[in-house]
Amino acid sequence: MAGLSFDNYQRNNFLAENSHTQPKATSTGTTIVGVKFNNGVVIAADTRSTQGPIVADKNCAKLHRISPKIWCAGAGTAADTEAVTQLIGSNIELHSLYTSREPRVVSALQMLKQHLFKYQGHIGAYLIVAGVDPTGSHLFSIHAHGSTDVGYYLSLGSGSLAAMAVLESHWKQDLTKEEAIKLASDAIQAGIWNDLGSGSNVDVCVMEIGKDAEYLRNYLTPNVREEKQKSYKFPRGTTAVLKESIVNICDIQEEQVDITA
Protein backbone atom coordinates (compact mmCIF):
# COMPACT_ATOMS: atom_id res chain seq x y z
CA MET A 1 0.00 0.00 0.00
CA ALA A 2 1.45 3.35 -1.04
CA GLY A 3 1.95 6.04 1.57
CA LEU A 4 4.18 7.15 4.42
CA SER A 5 5.48 4.70 7.00
CA PHE A 6 5.73 5.83 10.62
CA ASP A 7 7.15 2.54 11.93
CA ASN A 8 10.50 4.05 12.91
CA TYR A 9 8.82 7.02 14.60
CA GLN A 10 6.64 4.70 16.68
CA ARG A 11 9.63 2.51 17.49
CA ASN A 12 11.67 5.51 18.69
CA ASN A 13 8.81 6.70 20.90
CA PHE A 14 8.44 3.21 22.37
CA LEU A 15 12.16 3.04 23.15
CA ALA A 16 12.12 6.54 24.68
CA GLU A 17 9.20 5.59 26.94
CA ASN A 18 11.21 2.60 28.17
CA SER A 19 14.19 4.75 29.20
CA HIS A 20 16.24 4.03 26.08
CA THR A 21 17.96 7.25 25.04
CA GLN A 22 18.52 7.90 21.36
CA PRO A 23 22.16 7.65 20.24
CA LYS A 24 23.98 10.94 19.81
CA ALA A 25 25.47 11.78 16.42
CA THR A 26 29.25 12.10 16.36
CA SER A 27 30.50 15.52 15.30
CA THR A 28 32.76 15.42 12.26
CA GLY A 29 34.90 18.14 13.86
CA THR A 30 36.78 19.08 10.69
CA THR A 31 36.88 21.50 7.77
CA ILE A 32 37.69 20.09 4.31
CA VAL A 33 37.19 21.74 0.92
CA GLY A 34 37.75 21.08 -2.77
CA VAL A 35 38.03 23.63 -5.60
CA LYS A 36 38.36 23.05 -9.35
CA PHE A 37 40.50 25.33 -11.51
CA ASN A 38 41.41 25.61 -15.18
CA ASN A 39 43.78 22.68 -15.43
CA GLY A 40 43.10 20.64 -12.32
CA VAL A 41 41.65 20.53 -8.82
CA VAL A 42 42.73 21.47 -5.27
CA ILE A 43 41.71 19.94 -1.95
CA ALA A 44 42.57 21.31 1.50
CA ALA A 45 41.97 20.47 5.16
CA ASP A 46 42.73 21.65 8.67
CA THR A 47 44.89 19.53 11.00
CA ARG A 48 42.99 19.42 14.32
CA SER A 49 41.88 16.04 15.65
CA THR A 50 39.41 16.09 18.55
CA GLN A 51 38.13 13.60 21.10
CA GLY A 52 34.99 15.22 22.45
CA PRO A 53 36.05 18.59 23.92
CA ILE A 54 39.73 17.60 23.91
CA VAL A 55 42.23 18.36 21.14
CA ALA A 56 43.81 14.93 20.61
CA ASP A 57 46.24 15.89 17.82
CA LYS A 58 47.28 19.35 16.66
CA ASN A 59 48.81 18.23 13.37
CA CYS A 60 46.68 15.37 12.07
CA ALA A 61 46.91 14.56 8.34
CA LYS A 62 43.43 14.52 6.77
CA LEU A 63 44.46 14.33 3.11
CA HIS A 64 44.76 10.72 1.96
CA ARG A 65 46.39 9.28 -1.16
CA ILE A 66 44.31 6.87 -3.24
CA SER A 67 46.56 6.87 -6.31
CA PRO A 68 49.33 9.15 -7.62
CA LYS A 69 46.74 11.45 -9.24
CA ILE A 70 43.70 10.81 -7.00
CA TRP A 71 43.53 12.07 -3.42
CA CYS A 72 40.73 12.61 -0.93
CA ALA A 73 40.09 14.70 2.16
CA GLY A 74 38.40 12.97 5.09
CA ALA A 75 36.06 14.21 7.82
CA GLY A 76 34.37 12.16 10.52
CA THR A 77 35.86 9.32 12.55
CA ALA A 78 39.61 9.42 11.93
CA ALA A 79 40.07 5.65 12.06
CA ASP A 80 37.26 5.12 9.55
CA THR A 81 38.53 7.70 7.05
CA GLU A 82 42.05 6.27 7.25
CA ALA A 83 40.94 2.65 6.88
CA VAL A 84 38.44 3.18 4.07
CA THR A 85 40.85 5.26 1.98
CA GLN A 86 43.63 2.68 2.41
CA LEU A 87 41.22 -0.08 1.35
CA ILE A 88 40.01 1.78 -1.75
CA GLY A 89 43.56 2.82 -2.59
CA SER A 90 44.61 -0.84 -2.63
CA ASN A 91 41.59 -1.84 -4.72
CA ILE A 92 42.23 0.99 -7.19
CA GLU A 93 45.84 -0.17 -7.62
CA LEU A 94 44.68 -3.75 -8.27
CA HIS A 95 42.06 -2.48 -10.72
CA SER A 96 44.68 -0.39 -12.52
CA LEU A 97 47.03 -3.39 -12.83
CA TYR A 98 44.21 -5.63 -14.06
CA THR A 99 42.99 -3.18 -16.72
CA SER A 100 46.50 -1.93 -17.62
CA ARG A 101 45.33 1.68 -17.64
CA GLU A 102 45.44 4.76 -15.46
CA PRO A 103 42.75 4.66 -12.75
CA ARG A 104 39.70 6.86 -13.18
CA VAL A 105 38.37 9.14 -10.44
CA VAL A 106 34.84 7.80 -10.98
CA SER A 107 36.14 4.29 -10.26
CA ALA A 108 37.32 5.40 -6.81
CA LEU A 109 34.02 7.22 -6.31
CA GLN A 110 31.99 4.13 -7.18
CA MET A 111 34.04 1.87 -4.91
CA LEU A 112 33.74 4.29 -2.00
CA LYS A 113 30.00 4.89 -2.31
CA GLN A 114 29.22 1.16 -2.63
CA HIS A 115 31.37 0.34 0.40
CA LEU A 116 29.85 3.09 2.56
CA PHE A 117 26.26 2.37 1.48
CA LYS A 118 26.71 -1.27 2.46
CA TYR A 119 27.37 -0.23 6.06
CA GLN A 120 24.43 2.23 6.22
CA GLY A 121 26.38 5.09 7.79
CA HIS A 122 28.06 3.07 10.55
CA ILE A 123 31.42 3.84 8.93
CA GLY A 124 31.74 7.52 9.84
CA ALA A 125 33.64 8.68 6.78
CA TYR A 126 32.71 11.90 4.95
CA LEU A 127 35.02 12.37 1.98
CA ILE A 128 35.87 14.85 -0.76
CA VAL A 129 37.43 12.89 -3.63
CA ALA A 130 39.43 14.77 -6.26
CA GLY A 131 41.82 13.89 -9.02
CA VAL A 132 42.78 13.99 -12.67
CA ASP A 133 42.66 11.24 -15.31
CA PRO A 134 42.55 11.01 -19.13
CA THR A 135 38.95 12.31 -19.05
CA GLY A 136 39.88 15.54 -17.18
CA SER A 137 39.74 16.84 -13.61
CA HIS A 138 37.02 15.73 -11.21
CA LEU A 139 35.67 16.74 -7.79
CA PHE A 140 33.12 14.73 -5.76
CA SER A 141 31.86 14.52 -2.19
CA ILE A 142 30.66 11.35 -0.45
CA HIS A 143 28.63 11.14 2.76
CA ALA A 144 28.79 8.28 5.24
CA HIS A 145 25.54 6.73 3.97
CA GLY A 146 26.85 6.56 0.40
CA SER A 147 25.21 9.61 -1.17
CA THR A 148 27.43 11.62 -3.52
CA ASP A 149 27.59 15.10 -4.98
CA VAL A 150 29.58 16.82 -7.71
CA GLY A 151 30.50 20.48 -8.12
CA TYR A 152 33.08 23.13 -8.89
CA TYR A 153 33.63 23.71 -5.16
CA LEU A 154 32.63 21.54 -2.18
CA SER A 155 32.97 21.59 1.60
CA LEU A 156 32.32 19.07 4.39
CA GLY A 157 32.78 18.88 8.15
CA SER A 158 31.64 20.88 11.16
CA GLY A 159 33.36 23.98 9.77
CA SER A 160 31.82 23.58 6.32
CA LEU A 161 29.32 26.43 6.81
CA ALA A 162 32.07 29.00 7.35
CA ALA A 163 34.13 27.50 4.51
CA MET A 164 31.18 27.46 2.11
CA ALA A 165 30.49 31.13 2.84
CA VAL A 166 34.01 31.94 1.59
CA LEU A 167 33.74 29.61 -1.41
CA GLU A 168 30.38 30.97 -2.57
CA SER A 169 31.43 34.60 -2.21
CA HIS A 170 34.86 34.32 -3.88
CA TRP A 171 34.63 31.49 -6.42
CA LYS A 172 34.64 32.45 -10.10
CA GLN A 173 34.95 30.77 -13.48
CA ASP A 174 38.39 29.97 -14.90
CA LEU A 175 40.38 30.12 -11.66
CA THR A 176 44.14 29.79 -11.98
CA LYS A 177 46.10 27.30 -9.89
CA GLU A 178 47.35 30.01 -7.50
CA GLU A 179 43.86 31.50 -7.11
CA ALA A 180 42.37 28.07 -6.37
CA ILE A 181 45.01 27.34 -3.73
CA LYS A 182 44.38 30.71 -2.07
CA LEU A 183 40.60 30.24 -2.17
CA ALA A 184 40.83 26.75 -0.65
CA SER A 185 43.26 27.98 2.03
CA ASP A 186 41.02 30.94 2.90
CA ALA A 187 38.02 28.63 3.19
CA ILE A 188 39.89 26.32 5.58
CA GLN A 189 41.01 29.30 7.66
CA ALA A 190 37.38 30.43 7.92
CA GLY A 191 36.61 27.02 9.41
CA ILE A 192 39.62 27.22 11.73
CA TRP A 193 38.61 30.62 13.14
CA ASN A 194 34.84 29.96 13.37
CA ASP A 195 34.57 26.28 14.33
CA LEU A 196 35.89 24.82 17.60
CA GLY A 197 36.28 21.40 15.98
CA SER A 198 38.73 22.77 13.40
CA GLY A 199 42.11 24.34 14.02
CA SER A 200 45.89 24.40 13.75
CA ASN A 201 47.34 24.32 10.22
CA VAL A 202 46.23 24.14 6.57
CA ASP A 203 47.18 21.18 4.36
CA VAL A 204 46.78 21.45 0.57
CA CYS A 205 47.00 18.95 -2.29
CA VAL A 206 47.12 20.11 -5.93
CA MET A 207 46.33 17.79 -8.85
CA GLU A 208 47.06 19.06 -12.36
CA ILE A 209 46.34 17.30 -15.65
CA GLY A 210 49.45 15.49 -16.85
CA LYS A 211 51.21 15.63 -13.46
CA ASP A 212 51.25 13.64 -10.24
CA ALA A 213 49.62 15.21 -7.20
CA GLU A 214 51.59 17.81 -5.23
CA TYR A 215 51.05 17.44 -1.47
CA LEU A 216 51.75 20.65 0.47
CA ARG A 217 51.92 19.61 4.11
CA ASN A 218 51.41 22.52 6.55
CA TYR A 219 51.02 24.95 3.65
CA LEU A 220 49.84 27.60 6.14
CA THR A 221 50.50 27.70 9.89
CA PRO A 222 48.19 30.42 11.24
CA ASN A 223 48.42 29.14 14.83
CA VAL A 224 52.15 29.28 15.51
CA ARG A 225 52.87 29.15 19.24
CA GLU A 226 54.86 32.26 20.12
CA GLU A 227 57.48 32.37 22.84
CA LYS A 228 56.48 34.15 26.03
CA GLN A 229 57.89 37.66 26.23
CA LYS A 230 59.02 37.17 29.83
CA SER A 231 59.21 34.53 32.53
CA TYR A 232 56.04 34.01 34.55
CA LYS A 233 57.72 32.08 37.37
CA PHE A 234 57.21 33.85 40.70
CA PRO A 235 59.62 33.49 43.66
CA ARG A 236 58.50 31.68 46.79
CA GLY A 237 56.76 34.04 49.19
CA THR A 238 55.26 36.30 46.51
CA THR A 239 51.75 35.38 47.65
CA ALA A 240 51.17 36.23 51.32
CA VAL A 241 50.07 33.45 53.70
CA LEU A 242 47.03 34.77 55.58
CA LYS A 243 46.24 31.72 57.70
CA GLU A 244 47.98 28.48 58.58
CA SER A 245 46.35 25.41 60.12
CA ILE A 246 48.07 22.09 60.88
CA VAL A 247 45.84 19.10 61.60
CA ASN A 248 47.22 15.85 62.99
CA ILE A 249 45.41 13.10 61.13
CA CYS A 250 47.26 10.22 62.80
CA ASP A 251 49.21 9.45 65.97
CA ILE A 252 52.72 8.09 65.72
CA GLN A 253 53.74 5.62 68.42
CA GLU A 254 57.24 4.28 68.87
CA GLU A 255 57.95 0.91 70.48
CA GLN A 256 61.33 -0.61 71.21
CA VAL A 257 61.74 -4.37 71.13
CA ASP A 258 64.70 -6.08 72.73
CA ILE A 259 65.96 -8.83 70.43
CA THR A 260 69.06 -9.78 72.43
CA ALA A 261 67.25 -12.33 74.57
From Swiss-Prot:
Q: Which keywords has UniProt assigned to this entry?
A: Cytoplasm, Hydrolase, Nucleus, Protease, Proteasome, Threonine protease, Zymogen
Q: Where in the cell is it found?
A: Cytoplasm; Nucleus
What's the Enzyme Commission number for this chain? 3.4.25.1
Major place of residence:
cytoplasm
Biological-process GO terms, alphabetical: proteasomal ubiquitin-independent protein catabolic process; proteasome-mediated ubiquitin-dependent protein catabolic process
- Propeptide spans which residues? 1-29
The answer to whether UniProt assigns keyword Nucleotide-binding to this entry is: no
Kindly state which reaction or reactions the protein catalyses: Cleavage of peptide bonds with very broad specificity
Q: Name one GO molecular function term.
A: threonine-type endopeptidase activity
- Which GO cellular component term is one of those annotated? proteasome core complex, beta-subunit complex
> CDD domains this protein is in?
proteasome_beta_type_7
Annotated active site: 30
Provide the function of this protein: The proteasome degrades poly-ubiquitinated proteins in the cytoplasm and in the nucleus. It is essential for the regulated turnover of proteins and for the removal of misfolded proteins. The proteasome is a multicatalytic proteinase complex that is characterized by its ability to cleave peptides with Arg, Phe, Tyr, Leu, and Glu adjacent to the leaving group at neutral or slightly basic pH. It has an ATP-dependent proteolytic activity.
Quaternary structure?
Answer: The 26S proteasome consists of a 20S proteasome core and two 19S regulatory subunits. The 20S proteasome core is composed of 28 subunits that are arranged in four stacked rings, resulting in a barrel-shaped structure. The two end rings are each formed by seven alpha subunits, and the two central rings are each formed by seven beta subunits. The catalytic chamber with the active sites is on the inside of the barrel.
* Protein family according to the UniProt entry: Belongs to the peptidase T1B family.
Q: What is this protein called?
A: Proteasome subunit beta type-2
What is the name of the gene encoding this protein?
PUP1
